[in-house]
Amino acid sequence: MSLRLYSTLGRETREFTTVAPGEARMYVCGVTPYDVTHLGHAFSYVQFDTLRRYLSSIGYLVRYVQNVTDIDDDMIMVSRRQGGRPIPEIRDENDRIFRNDLDRLNVLRPSAYPFATEHIGEIIEHTAKLIECGHAYVVDGDVFFEARTFERYGQLNGVTLEELEQRENPESKRAEKKRGKLDFLLWQIVDAGDPSWPSPWGPGRPGWSIECTAMSVAHLGPRIDIHGGGSDLRFPHHENEIAQAECSTGDAPFSGFWMHNGMLKLEGVKMSKSLGNLVLARNLMQEFEPDQLRLYLLSHHYRADADYYHGDLEQLGERYGRLKLASSQGEGAAAAASSGRALIAEFRETIDNDFDAPVALDVLDAAASRLLAGAGSDGEGEALRECLAVLGFAFAGAKGPASGYLGSTL
């Protein structure tokens, strides 16, 4: 069985293929570092990190790009609230905490980690191209993408443009200037004192979605294999990305697979700073080992919404301890023994089924139980360790955050 992944675009699970043989190009939407990151962010990045590790283990050279949205409304708002504190200072402080959290969770560092403010030139170039091609228009220094000029707008969400017009649109800024309700900003004029850059349309700053398009194309080219992000980004952000990327570059599809992780809530309620219910990964890692938190996150299917309840990690302690202890059984033995090959094959079969990490962990749980009961072989112990390493567990010898290309292991 070959790897099959579910793509939001088309609502189907199909065989994973890439633009360039043997190479997988992944772009995952990163954070806006106006505040510290919470458990929901950790859920997303651990899931995509594990997929990246699996692709490497089966022979792909993975080019993984994750951006930083370091200029947007939220960054400006926080700067104002903090008495005009410089945005780069806010960004660097929160980004440092974020990177440290992911390092402790053994998340591999991206192949490229671009900041939006480093790509203003490319953003302006894409915007100018979209105007030239008739997909964008200028109104008093603001530049809008005209959604109706892209006939497939709505395809990612499986609806027509008319149906999307009935939805609440988070990109409703400057509505009085728009030709159509779904049109969105590519470039915008700014209030006095806010960060701005020179452009053919006057001083301003980028819109939200064009930033990701410019960074993805700059680092991975006009076509990629996997675009990842939270399910809350499907509309309008990812819908906009498809439209502007394919219209600007002339290449399609922009991404072969669109993968969206579910939302992690706190006891049924969305985590948000305004509600004061953020669960911070760094706080949990003061009480529990980072690998135990990683196990908790991978015990939920990446596409499913999940609820975090206080006490969940504590209840996971026995399972974590069993896997950790069993992974030391038969150390140094060859996983090529028949029992080891069988375990690896069963593990791969579950991951190949739309990256089903929870079922893969069940398979490894069963192997751990056999080993601890004295019914497993040394080869199975080594195979267990290899599989746990592919899932990114440091206790099993997984490569650390600073590792580059991992190479084949399974």
Label the predicted regions.
Residues 1-34, 49, 121-329:
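Alpha-helical recognition segments enriched in aromatics with Gly/Pro capping
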Residues 68-73, 95-98, 108-123, 141-150:
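Short, glycine/charge-rich beta-strand/loop segments that flank catalytic centers
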Residues 78-87, 111-117, 230:
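The substrate-binding groove and active-site-proximal loops of carbohydrate-active enzymes
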Residues 61-63, 134-140, 371:
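Short, well-structured beta-strand/strand-turn elements
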Residues 52, 56, 99-102, 131, ...:
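Structural signal for well-ordered, non-membrane alpha-helices
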Residues 270-272, 277-410:
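Structural preference for alpha-helix termini/caps and helix-kink/transition segments
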Residues 10-13, 19-106:
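N-terminal, positively charged nucleic-acid-binding surface of large information/translation enzymes
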